[in-house]
């Protein structure tokens, strides 16, 4: 049924010569174009072109020399009524769509990144060469720390406080050997997390105490 209606909707009359651009005169006058005949359901739907009106334009536009020849034609100012639709030049600006907004976001992000990089470069160049950032403190491992705390204030060296374990090991070593060689002194310092000077001073003080005690005992014996 649909194919029958589609085939019978428009039926063109027998072959009509094609539209010839060379026989149209000045830009294709309507009078020189052959009329087409169409029929549908027994009705004649032929198209006829009215004869052209005399004109003084080269392009076939009807423009009378006297503007009073068409009194019914409204003026241009009257045509532009308050409720008229805007023309092509007066068309409202188009609202940017979703895709244009998405395309504008990367551009804004790139501008923000570039401005941030410029600010960082200015901040780096603004610092003088002498005022550089302080170096990070060196990492201290447990084996590098010492058990004693020695603080130097007012140019005077404070007394070294030995731990109980250090004192016990030094007393054992003094009991077997009251005078240490440099090699043995370095070995004990490494084992007790002390330096060679501290070991040397401790043995000096311990020998003085030992001599003092021995003198006291000799006097009491007399």
Swiss-Prot record:
Keywords: Developmental protein, DNA-binding, Homeobox, Nucleus, Transcription, Transcription regulation
DNA-binding region coordinates: 155-214
GO MF, any single term: DNA-binding transcription factor activity
GO cellular component: cell junction; chromatin; nucleoplasm; nucleus
Chain span(s) of sequence motif Antp-type hexapeptide: 140-145
Low complexity compositional bias, start-end: 74-85
Source organism superkingdom: Eukaryota
Name assigned to this protein: Homeobox protein Hox-C5
Gene (name only): HOXC5
